Design a protein with these regions (language model features):
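Conserved beta-strand in the GNAT
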Residues: 58, 62-79
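A conserved short alpha-helix in the GNAT/GCN5 acetyltransferase fold that borders
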Residues: 85, 94-102
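A short helix-loop-beta-strand connector motif used in the catalytic cores of GNAT acetyltransferases and
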Residues: 40-57, 74
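Conserved GNAT acetyl-CoA-binding A-motif
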Residues: 100-112
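Conserved active-site alpha-helix within GNAT-family acetyltransferase domains
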Residues: 87, 91-92, 112-119
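Conserved GNAT-fold acetyl-CoA-binding loop/helix
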Residues: 18-45
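A short beta-loop-alpha structural element at the N-terminal edge
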Residues: 1-15
Length: 119
C-alpha cells in the first residue's frame, strides 16, 4: 500500500530516507558526512520539501519500506530500505510516483546509482 506522508508518519519516512541515503552514499562520501544524515535531519529536509509543495509518499507492506517525492513532474528521493531492494518495490513506488506527476515525469538519480538506472 502506498500512503501520503504527513506529520503523523513523517519520522517513519525520514528513517527510511536516512538509512537508505547513508547506504547509497557510503561509497563516495566521508563517514563523518554520512553520519550527519540522521532521521531527525532527514525529517527536517522532507518537511521543508512538503512545505514547499512537494508531495511525499511511503510504501508500506508489513512495515514501511520505501519513500519517494514528487514535485510537479520531478520524481526524487526514491529510497527503498537496503534489505528490501531488488524485490520490485522501487518499481512499484516509481510507477505510482509517475501517476502523481502533473507535468512530464522526470526521475532524478545520482549519476553513479546503477540500481536506480535499472528502474
Amino acid at each position: 500500500m502506498i500512503v501520503p506522508v504527513d506529520e503523523t508518519n513523517l519520522l517513519q519516512a525520514a528513517t527510511i530516507h536516512s538509512i537508505s541515503w547513508k547506504e547509497s552514499h557510503r561509497a563516495f562520501c566521508t563517514p563523518d558526512f554520512i553520519e550527519t544524515h540522521t532521521p531527525d535531519r532527514q525529517r527536517e529536509y522532507l518537511r521543508n520539501k512538503m512545505n514547499n509543495g512537494t508531495k511525499l509518499y511511503m510504501l508500506v507492506e508489513e512495515k514501511p519500506i520505501g519513500v519517494v517525492s514528487v514535485t510537479k513532474g520531478l520524481i526524487e528521493d526514491l529510497y527503498i530500505l537496503p534489505d528490501m531492494q531488488n524485490m520490485g518495490y522501487g518499481t512499484k513506488l516509481l510507477l505510482y510516483a509517475v501517476g502523481q506527476c502533473t507535468d512530464t515525469p522526470t526521475l532524478w538519480i545520482l549519476e553513479n546509482n546503477i540500481n536506480a538506472e535499472r528502474l
